[in-house]
Amino acid sequence: MSTATELLARTPLLVRRGPYVLAAWAPAQISAVCQGLLRCRTGHGVVILDELEASALLPEHALAEMPPARHVQRGFALITLGTPMEWNVTGVLAAVSGALADAGVPLGAAAAFSRDHLFVPVDRLDDALAALQPLCAEVRVLA
């Protein structure tokens, strides 16, 4: 079993500068939101459904394919922890969020089955990468 430090040390940071948006719809609109993601073929997005809302983190241009959102927050970059996360390892997000908090960088996080995704303000991306780079294997800017 790996420790959080060991796992992060072999993890590349996959960076998409964006801009990304975080948007929210009524839960009943989840089908339309997912259809919009399929139509725009972004390849990158995070969708979460709970009893209060359907939320999505997606490239800003993808909003054109979506039903009107009731809330939109703009100006995010997306950082993906590029190594599959081991579910028995504790402290990965704590280490990442601690480093960003120490640098004063706001953070949102979402987990997929095997990877964690972080979203930070675009204007703080360089600060975020400077804070995270000592923990991780490398930084790869994808877009």
Regions from the language model: what does each represent?
Residues 114, 124-125:
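A generic "binding-loop/recognition-motif" signal
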Residues 1-99, 103, 127-143:
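Regulatory modules associated with amino-acid/nitrogen control
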Residues 119-122:
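Short glycine/threonine-rich loop-to-helix capping motif typified by GTGT followed
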Residues 103-116:
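A cross-kingdom feature marking solvent-exposed beta-strand/loop segments within repeated
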